């Protein structure tokens, strides 16, 4: 409740130095040819000044007052009655401008008090009595004073429980120091006074509240174009009670600096509404697009932006902070039927309240109109992310729901990331959940199987991704067969039944019966031949039995199925018991003939495919007994045997290095040897190479 930004105190340096000009000159033009009461004196003056123009510059004091008052205006607009700002003017003494009372926490009171204070006089002699230290001492005393909220919290506790009330604050001191040594002196004095104040507030005296923590921000102001010897410094912890940061800024840029600071002090965000159509002030028949910058809570952007959206940001000229750029959209009436589903609403205040575009936008919203703001996505399209509207004389920004709203219907399970999937096994999943319920027992049963064995090991989510579970709707005995396969306590009778069903599948495959598929749009059902369908069926059935092979009966079924696959040409024989089972099938008078492997269309294609299949089987059987290094080495040896080796390596004895071009460079041999004697050597070398 009592955060550090609840109390903010501005300490303004009112010494003689702040009476000098900021060196930022503003041009001023007079209207020409207008008659005045003094017989045209104004017109003459206008002609005189109109040719050359006139300029003036604000003082350092004016720049400090304007920017600090704008700071408190933003705070009071966005947090009315919740956040408090005080002003203290320091020269020969500390002058209190306002208090924590709500009656003095308004713009009218502060501006009237600043008008009475006035600009520092240049005629005042330089004296050590003029110092900003008086204001810093008064600021620490003001932090120890309770606000109305703290007084209400203190009323709920006894007198012995006053230290339980949190008391934190921030002091923003606008001054001008010569160098870092002077700035260090200010920090030490402030820290010393802070410790002394907490000593006075501690029992038994209890003069005010104990200050838990203070954040001191020192703004060192210099005229435009003047270099300062004070260096900038980020937030530094001086003591457990005090954090200090220092900023050196020119007088014309102090407003941008305070706007940047207020974003972090109150967790605010800046939004620039672009492409606002407005009539030209000088030409009412034409219009131009303007931009208006507004401030609001940072949550207005954070709760809207998702992973598929990005906030377009930019940096305003002269500023150092980022602003989110949103585009003006078609205005709508602020009726109940036009309100969009929103995630939150937050108060809004313009940065430059006196500019013409800001006043036009404010009046437009206060007249009962609403404005939609567009935010571009990463893909390039735009989305309406925010809306500006006014109610009760206050302007709000609404964060619209750009994703699926909570008021919409729940998304259909068929609208998954892979497209429309309509064959989910929803009913089977519900039965599986009921069968997999776990109930705690008072006494642990040591003979009970572990939980991992009882969990399902194979469950296709869709019907089209499975052959077994797709056919159970069309083959009457298949559901009971699948139920027997996953039983934990399979007995001999269940094994015999499963053997009969497997034998029935084998007879259907031998007759060439097509499996009763209703559709073949699954990835595994694209093959239309009966043999291929049965081969896929056997593979999935073997996978299901392997995952549930917890008893000897399951293992017997697995061996018999592997023997069937071997007879079908899909897998080699695994063991001797499987071969015996295969012989019992084939030697029976009712058993079908042994199925041949799949062949291509045409006589020539069948012979080539059979040879390739046999060769691949031989390679796979041989690869199972060799390592990967042996396979690669044999492949390299087979390639190297196709070409002759280098002649130098063949002629050189083992263990020695072959010399390349041994006759190269011997001039005597080249001159003595005739061309006839060289020719056989060349031929011999060419033959060797």
UniProtKB/Swiss-Prot annotation:
<keyword id="KW-0131">Cell cycle</keyword>
<keyword id="KW-0175">Coiled coil</keyword>
<keyword id="KW-0221">Differentiation</keyword>
<comment type="similarity">
    <text>Belongs to the Integrator subunit 13 family.</text>
</comment>
<keyword id="KW-0744">Spermatogenesis</keyword>
<dbReference type="GO" id="GO:0046843">
    <property type="term" value="P:dorsal appendage formation"/>
</dbReference>
<feature type="short sequence motif" description="Nuclear localization signal (NLS)">
    <location>
        <begin position="613"/>
        <end position="619"/>
    </location>
</feature>
<keyword id="KW-0132">Cell division</keyword>
<keyword id="KW-0539">Nucleus</keyword>
<dbReference type="GO" id="GO:0007283">
    <property type="term" value="P:spermatogenesis"/>
</dbReference>
<dbReference type="GO" id="GO:0051301">
    <property type="term" value="P:cell division"/>
</dbReference>
<keyword id="KW-0498">Mitosis</keyword>
<dbReference type="GO" id="GO:0007346">
    <property type="term" value="P:regulation of mitotic cell cycle"/>
</dbReference>
<dbReference type="GO" id="GO:0030317">
    <property type="term" value="P:flagellated sperm motility"/>
</dbReference>
<dbReference type="GO" id="GO:0051642">
    <property type="term" value="P:centrosome localization"/>
</dbReference>
<dbReference type="GO" id="GO:0051663">
    <property type="term" value="P:oocyte nucleus localization involved in oocyte dorsal/ventral axis specification"/>
</dbReference>
<feature type="region of interest" description="Disordered">
    <location>
        <begin position="665"/>
        <end position="689"/>
    </location>
</feature>
<feature type="compositionally biased region" description="Low complexity">
    <location>
        <begin position="599"/>
        <end position="614"/>
    </location>
</feature>
<dbReference type="GO" id="GO:0080154">
    <property type="term" value="P:regulation of fertilization"/>
</dbReference>
<dbReference type="GO" id="GO:0048471">
    <property type="term" value="C:perinuclear region of cytoplasm"/>
</dbReference>
<keyword id="KW-0963">Cytoplasm</keyword>
<dbReference type="GO" id="GO:0160232">
    <property type="term" value="C:INTAC complex"/>
</dbReference>
<dbReference type="GO" id="GO:0005634">
    <property type="term" value="C:nucleus"/>
</dbReference>
<dbReference type="Pfam" id="PF10221">
    <property type="entry name" value="Mat89Bb"/>
</dbReference>
<keyword id="KW-0217">Developmental protein</keyword>
<dbReference type="GO" id="GO:0034472">
    <property type="term" value="P:snRNA 3'-end processing"/>
</dbReference>
<dbReference type="InterPro" id="IPR019355">
    <property type="entry name" value="Cell_cycle_regulator_Mat89Bb"/>
</dbReference>
<dbReference type="GO" id="GO:0005737">
    <property type="term" value="C:cytoplasm"/>
</dbReference>
<feature type="region of interest" description="Disordered">
    <location>
        <begin position="592"/>
        <end position="619"/>
    </location>
</feature>
<dbReference type="GO" id="GO:0051321">
    <property type="term" value="P:meiotic cell cycle"/>
</dbReference>
<protein>
    <recommendedName>
        <fullName>Protein asunder</fullName>
    </recommendedName>
</protein>
<comment type="subunit">
    <text>Belongs to the multiprotein complex Integrator, at least composed of IntS1, IntS2, IntS3, IntS4, omd/IntS5, IntS6, defl/IntS7, IntS8, IntS9, IntS10, IntS11, IntS12, asun/IntS13, IntS14 and IntS15. The core complex associates with protein phosphatase 2A subunits mts/PP2A and Pp2A-29B, to form the Integrator-PP2A (INTAC) complex.</text>
</comment>
<comment type="function">
    <text>Component of the integrator complex, a multiprotein complex that terminates RNA polymerase II (Pol II) transcription in the promoter-proximal region of genes. The integrator complex provides a quality checkpoint during transcription elongation by driving premature transcription termination of transcripts that are unfavorably configured for transcriptional elongation: the complex terminates transcription by (1) catalyzing dephosphorylation of the C-terminal domain (CTD) of Pol II subunit Polr2A/Rbp1 and Spt5, and (2) degrading the exiting nascent RNA transcript via endonuclease activity.</text>
</comment>
<feature type="coiled-coil region">
    <location>
        <begin position="521"/>
        <end position="550"/>
    </location>
</feature>
<dbReference type="GO" id="GO:0160240">
    <property type="term" value="P:RNA polymerase II transcription initiation surveillance"/>
</dbReference>
<dbReference type="GO" id="GO:0032039">
    <property type="term" value="C:integrator complex"/>
</dbReference>
<dbReference type="GO" id="GO:0060814">
    <property type="term" value="P:posterior mRNA localization involved in anterior/posterior axis specification"/>
</dbReference>
<keyword id="KW-0469">Meiosis</keyword>
<keyword id="KW-0597">Phosphoprotein</keyword>
């Amino acid at each position: 409740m009592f955060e550090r930004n609840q109390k903010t105190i501005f300490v303004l340096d009112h010494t003689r130095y702040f009476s000098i000009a900021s060196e930022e000159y503003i041009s001023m033009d007079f209207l020409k040819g207008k008659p005045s009461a003094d017989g045209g004196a104004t017109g003459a003056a206008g002609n005189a000044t109109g040719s050359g123009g006139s300029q003036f510059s604000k003082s350092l004091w004016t720049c400090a007052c304007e920017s600090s008052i704008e700071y408190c205006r933003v705070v009071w607009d966005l947090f009315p009655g919740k956040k408090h700002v005080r002003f203290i003017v320091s020269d020969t003494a500390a002058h209190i401008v306002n208090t924590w009372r709500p009656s003095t926490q308004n713009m009218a009171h502060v501006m009237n008090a600043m008008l009475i204070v006035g600009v520092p006089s240049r005629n005042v002699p330089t004296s050590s009595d003029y110092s900003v230290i008086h204001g810093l001492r008064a600021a620490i005393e003001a932090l120890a004073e309770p606000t109305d909220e703290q007084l209400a919290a203190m009323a709920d506790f006894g007198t012995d429980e006053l230290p339980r009330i949190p008391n934190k604050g921030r002091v923003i001191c606008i001054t001008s120091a010569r160098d870092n040594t002077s700035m260090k002196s200010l920090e030490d004095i402030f820290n010393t006074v802070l410790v002394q104040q907490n000593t006075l507030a501690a029992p038994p005296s209890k003069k005010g509240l104990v200050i838990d923590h203070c954040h001191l921000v020192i703004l060192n102001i210099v005229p435009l174009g003047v270099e300062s010897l004070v260096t900038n410094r980020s937030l530094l912890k001086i003591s457990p009670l005090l954090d200090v940061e220092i900023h050196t800024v020119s007088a014309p840029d102090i407003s941008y600096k305070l706007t940047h600071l207020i974003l972090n002090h109150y967790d605010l965000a800046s939004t620039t509404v672009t492409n606002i159509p407005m009539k030209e002030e000088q030409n009412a028949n034409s219009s131009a697009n303007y931009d208006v910058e507004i401030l609001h809570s940072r949550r207005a952007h954070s709760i809207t932006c998702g992973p598929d959206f990005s906030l377009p940001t930019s940096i305003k000229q002269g500023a150092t902070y980022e602003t989110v750029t949103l585009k003006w959209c078609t205005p709508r009436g602020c009726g109940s039927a036009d309100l969009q589903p929103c995630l939150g609403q937050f108060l809004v205040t313009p940065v430059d309240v006196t500019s013409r575009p800001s006043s036009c936008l404010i009046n437009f919203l206060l007249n009962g109109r609403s404005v939609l703001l567009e935010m571009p996505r990463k893909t390039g399209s735009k989305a309406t992310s925010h809306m500006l509207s006014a109610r009760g004389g206050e302007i709000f920004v609404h964060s619209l729901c750009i994703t699926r709203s909570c008021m919409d219907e729940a998304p259909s399970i068929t609208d998954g990331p892979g497209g429309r999937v309509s064959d989910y096994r929803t009913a089977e999943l519900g039965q599986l959940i009921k069968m997999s319920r776990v109930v705690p027992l008072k006494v642990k049963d040591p003979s009970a199987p572990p939980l991992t064995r009882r969990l399902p090991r194979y469950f296709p989510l869709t019907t089209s991704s499975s052959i077994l579970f797709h056919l159970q709707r069309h083959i009457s005995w298949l559901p009971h067969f699948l139920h027997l396969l996953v039983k934990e306590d399979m007995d001999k009778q269940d094994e015999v039944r499963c053997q009969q069903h497997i034998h029935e599948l084998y007879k259907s495959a031998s007759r060439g019966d097509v499996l009763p598929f209703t559709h073949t749009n699954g990835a595994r059902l694209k093959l239309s031949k009966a043999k291929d369908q049965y081969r896929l069926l056997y593979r999935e059935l073997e996978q299901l039995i392997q995952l549930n092979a917890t008893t000897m009966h399951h293992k017997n079924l697995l061996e018999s199925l592997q023997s069937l696959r071997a007879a079908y040409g899909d897998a080699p024989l695994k063991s001797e018991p499987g071969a015996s089972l295969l012989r019992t099938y084939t030697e029976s008078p009712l058993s079908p003939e042994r199925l041949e492997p799949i062949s291509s269309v045409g006589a020539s294609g069948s012979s080539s495919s059979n040879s390739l299949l046999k060769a691949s089987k031989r390679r796979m059987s041989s690869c199972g007994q060799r390592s990967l290094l042996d396979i690669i080495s044999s492949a390299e040896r087979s390639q190297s045997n196709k070409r002759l080796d280098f002649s130098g390596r063949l002629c050189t004895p083992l263990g020695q290095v072959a010399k390349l071009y041994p006759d190269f460079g011997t001039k005597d041999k080249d001159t003595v040897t005739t061309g006839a004697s060289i020719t056989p050597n060349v031929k011999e070398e060419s033959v060797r190479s």
